Amino acid sequence: MRVRLSDKNIKELYPNIGNLLRTTRLGNLKSLLQDDYTGDNDCTVTAIACVLKISYDKVLPVATKYGYTSKKGTNPLKVRNIMQETIPNGYVAKSAYGKGIGCTLKKLETILKTTPIVLNLWNDGRSYYKNHSVVIIGVDVYEHGVFLRVYDGWHLETSLIDYKKLSIIMNINWVEEV
């Protein structure tokens, strides 16, 4: 199913989803598009710039120092290091690995009360995203489904990821005040 999931088609693609039970959303973040920058495979660099609300040009040299190339992209295990070097004093970068292990739904909802999250995913379970980084800005919990609300770097509007179908191979990165 290689179709972008959004508010416009969620009821069509998930007709038995039921009612929205609760939502957690950040409203003070601007979406960034990868096409607005010069690199290829720069989804992680774009996502970090979006989350930290800093210039792409400030993130790129640090990402390059940690192995980013336009041919291979960014090693997901280095995202926390890149974020730590680019955030202002008084903050610390954090990471969690594996859906249901370090990255539970409860943890996502707790973090999203204060800050957006960089999600490095291997596969979204719907064959739309593969080996891609997005910015999580919300969680929508329905009677029969849970969806991550994301900026994917390809669209200005939010897209949705079916949390239940998300691959266990993934990690999240965010910042907290010290």
Indicate where each model-derived feature is located.
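Conserved active-site-adjacent core of cysteine acyl-enzyme catalytic domains
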Residues: I54-Y56, P61-V178
